[in-house]
């Protein structure tokens, strides 16, 4: 049959690249589950009353090449001025060896959060290095493995200060008046929901204020002044006030560590260690505190532990602090951190080492000294005598200076009264300084860089002697070895080989949607047009970003059935928080600020109650029935009991039990009947897109995990993006921004993230995905995700019972395998199965969530039938191994499951097990062997012997 030209052009080619099973494989699986077609299958599973009659109008699909060309044209509208704005963001030089071998490497960016440490030792080591950098530079005892950005780290510092404060009746938090404005913005937003009063004043006036439990200082103020706060911190400590200090990571290379001056908490952005500005993110924040406060710290902490053989191994420590365990009592609602960006920063420190970092920091400072000397020589006045990289220059003709700067394609900071701010960075050259002289002084300034250099080289007084660092940093061998590109490349590869990512095997984690992160989607994030923009540049320089963001928002509006989308939240947890704040502020606008009860089903993800608590709400749990659905009788009772105090319900759809609840619309109606709002958690949107939508179902607000449904990679535990979709009545209450107020910023509410559009530079990934898939492909992706899950469930249900099903025994896009009966019969647990899967070359499914003693499997649409069958065969082989234990062939205390995973060194060691080496490391069906480098971790040892900094190199060998 002759094909038409349209068929030959094949604009939907990417759909077949993204979706794993081809048409023949799909039909085989449909036959296996007893369905005639994808439409028939979804028609059976999804409740009729919520199925969309017509697909969302997001356009036809485009090829990879057409979409890249279209996005390149949009990106070209961005103007790449040289930005000296500062305010916590600077241009960087990302070493190409890190760009190519990490940021552009799926072995790093497609990995999941390291909850399974045996398959995560590489990125755990890189994160431990990040913690060591933090400890060395801050002078404190404990460091986390990254937070979302500097401003949210400040908010976390405030919350932590209250948790550890001995002044239990104090309710005021003091912020020095020269912290970055975006930091203050986020702190104020968080303080409102916690009921704290924020006082902003000159740091030296802090002692004038009463009932203060915590203080936030900034070592290098937002306009550049270096502060020696030693005496002030000492006085504050004598009054039992918790002191937090915001610090610049590059300045800390030269400046005294705040921890040495007595600070309790030190935090800041690691952006300038090699991570592009990206119009605001993503960037990792560093966070450190005194040892005595370690159990009150937010975020993940990597600790050194032992494996079952006694070898040194790394793991995430003290997880009992986190939301997935402590729920509303957690230290934070953080689920996604910034692992990929923290690892870039840590490897930047490894590559440059202490000598290289000091050279960079000294060069920045020298050029700043030269600029200052030249300007002063010509009669201009500096606001501050002490500075590192930022000058606040008083100018008589400010308008003229800014006009000349614009003509030279230069951005200066312009929001300072009668002055301009200039922040230099590692990309600044002597030619740039000469250009700045011309902008500020005119072309005939007559200044010479070399002459000025001689003047300042031996007589710099811009850093107070007491503020100069007098201790060594980064003395660990890892920071003093890998300085040639060859060595660095091999070190990074050695780390990558230790981990299991999507470039090696399917990652069947339920509730995580580990789908393909296509190369075409990833390419634009490193384009200079997207990577090099300052988040506070003039709006007319970011027209490409604004167009791309507006298009993406429009598509998401259509896909969700909402009326507006806010892009600011830079993680799913932040999206939850922002959505709940919108609900809170909406109620307040209706003079119903007393509505503070949030109903949450017992099956909910741990971030839900943690976010509700952070938003100042009381959590009331709604029971689930024996089938895992929300108990409508209990819901009505709880809603009626809450009455006029009902704020909202947080539900996930399909439910966290892996089914489409038939009564979801009734749930929405009950809550609305009692004056509440419906927050529909977008974690499972991959089973909705093109089939139904939150807005159509009846919800009022949702966050969308762009790092799940819309293809942003997980990065080993971040970055993520959690924009929120809202109905029109909530649109005025989504986050705004105090620094950037342009079209697309819907409101003037407080910010939840440092940058106006969150992690803007990864939004092109989701733009590309939607553009290449089109309406047709997006719906098909959801349908195949559902098919793949039902295929796995149908083939495994006889060996591992599927705990919850919907109509006709079907599941949604994931299924829960009940291991509890097997454990009762044999003693083999879900943990043993999870670790044994490593020997078969797979990352484990989600363990014991949402039900203890289970495994939740989500295959996504991107896995082919071949890979699904490989996983199914592995699970069936493991079931046969369990039967061997049950039959007494292998003892419960010594079998391939309880000893899993097995490592290479066991092949040449004494072998006293009742099963063979071949069974241990090459079980049935394993061809392309993945080798874990450690055996099962000893979690108890790790938490009892907490050690969170680098260990001797010999320990890794």
UniProtKB/Swiss-Prot annotation:
One GO CC term on file: glycine cleavage complex
Catalytic activity from the UniProt record: N(6)-[(R)-lipoyl]-L-lysyl-[glycine-cleavage complex H protein] + glycine + H(+) = N(6)-[(R)-S(8)-aminomethyldihydrolipoyl]-L-lysyl-[glycine-cleavage complex H protein] + CO2
Modified sites of kind N6-(pyridoxal phosphate)lysine: 708
GO molecular function, one term: pyridoxal phosphate binding
Oxidoreductase is among the record's keywords: yes
CDD domains referenced in this protein's UniProt entry, alphabetically: GDC-P
GO biological process: glycine decarboxylation via glycine cleavage system
InterPro entries: GcvP, GDC-P_C, GDC-P_N, GDC_P, PyrdxlP-dep_Trfase, PyrdxlP-dep_Trfase_major, PyrdxlP-dep_Trfase_small
Enzyme class: oxidoreductase
Source organism, top-level taxon: Bacteria
Coiled-coil residue windows: none
EC number: 1.4.4.2
UniProtKB keywords: Oxidoreductase, Pyridoxal phosphate
CC cofactor: pyridoxal 5'-phosphate
HAMAP family cross-referenced by the UniProt entry: GcvP (MF_00711)
The protein's role, per its UniProt record: The glycine cleavage system catalyzes the degradation of glycine. The P protein binds the alpha-amino group of glycine through its pyridoxal phosphate cofactor; CO(2) is released and the remaining methylamine moiety is then transferred to the lipoamide cofactor of the H protein.
Quaternary structure note: The glycine cleavage system is composed of four proteins: P, T, L and H.
NCBIfam families in alphabetical order: gcvP, PRK04366.1
Family: Belongs to the GcvP family.
Protein name: Glycine dehydrogenase (decarboxylating)
